[in-house]
Amino acid sequence: MADNPSGLVIETYKLTKIYQNRQIALNDVTLSIEPGSVLGLLGPNGAGKTTFLRLVLGLHRPTAGWVKLFGKTMSPNAADLRRRMGYIPTNPQFPAGMTPITYLDYVARLFGLTSDSRKPRLASLIRAVDLLPVSGEPIAGFSNGMTSRLAVAASLINEPDLLIWDEPTHGLDPEARRSMLELIKRLSREKSLIVSSHNLSDVDEVCNHAAVLSRGQLIYNGSLQDLKGRMRRNHYELDLEGDQKAITKATAAIKNMTEFKTVSLKQRRLELRLNDDSTNTSALANVFMTLADSKVTLVSIRSVGQQTEQAFLDLVEKEESRGFARAYQVEEAA
C-alpha cells in the first residue's frame, strides 16, 4: 500500500491523445478503477475505446494527462507494470503452426517463468480453458471459440492482477459466449477487469461499473445501476381487453394527445412513445382515463427496452445533440 497510497488499480487524469496534431482521439478523460471492479468500457465505433486501452497498456504516450497503474505512472518503458496485466485484443491472432503448448510456453518464457514453474502453469491453464484434448494440435485448425480460450490462457499465464479484454465475446457462438461470460464472473472474484464491448447485455451481466466514451470524451463513469437510473422511461406497451371498436376509438383519442410522439395499436396491444418534454405520470394518467371512459380494461403495462442499452443510447444521443449545438453556436459566431 505504501507504493500505491490511493489503493486504485487504474487512475487517469485529463488523459488526452491527439494524432498527427489534428485528430483528437481522446480528450480530457479522468476516471479511477478500484480493486475488484469489473469495468464495462462502452461507446460507438470511433469513440476512443481502443485509444484508451492502448494508453492504459502503455503502448502509446499520452499527448496530455497521465495514466497510473497500481500507483505508478504508465509509459512505454514500464515493463514492470505490464507484467501485472493480462491483455486480449479483438480477434486475437496466433502463429498457425504452433500448438497451444508451444505458444503458451513461448509466452511464459517472455514473462521470465522458469522451466520448473512453466510446466505446471501451462498444464493448469490448458485444463482450465478446456483445450487439453487439442493441446498438441496446430492452432490453424481452431474454431473462434477455441482461439478465444487460448487467448484467455495466454492472458493469465503471468498471474496478472488486472485483465484488459477487448471484445472478448466477439464472433463467438452462443455456447462459447456463455462460457466466456461465466469465466469472467469467476475471475472477477479475485481480479480487476476492463471489458470493452459492443454487446450491452454482456456488460449488464458481468460488469459492476461502466465508462461510456463518445467522440473521445468520457460522458459517464459510475455504477451500472446509476446508468440504468438515467434511462428515459418514455416507451410503454399496454395490453388491453374489451370490444375491439372501443379499443380503436380510445386509440384514436390517445393519438390526438400532444404528449406522445407515436401511438400504435396491434390487435389489443397499445404502444406509446412519449415526447422528450412530456411528464410520464400525467401523460399516462390521461391514457388511463381515456381507456376507462371507453370501457376498455388495462390488463398490463410495461416499460420497453433493455435497460442498459437504452440508458447507453440515451447518453450518446444527448452528447451528440450537445456536440451539434456547440458546433452550431461556433458557426453562428463566425
Predicted features and spans:
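A short linear hydrophobic-aromatic micro-motif
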Residues: 130, 178, 259-263, 297-302
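Alpha-helical elements of the RecA-like P-loop NTPase motor core of helicases
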Residues: 96, 248, 310
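Short, surface-exposed acidic/glycine-rich loop or hinge patches that mediate macromolecular interfaces
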Residues: 20, 72-75, 218, 241-244, ...
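ABC transporter nucleotide-binding domain
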Residues: 180-275
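ABC transporter nucleotide-binding domains
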Residues: 7-12, 17-214, 219-220
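Conserved beta-strand edge residues that scaffold enzyme active sites
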Residues: 122, 140, 268, 305-306
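C-terminal coupling/interaction segments
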Residues: 2, 276-334
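Non-catalytic surface loops within mature trypsin-like serine protease
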Residues: 35, 133, 242-244, 276-278, ...
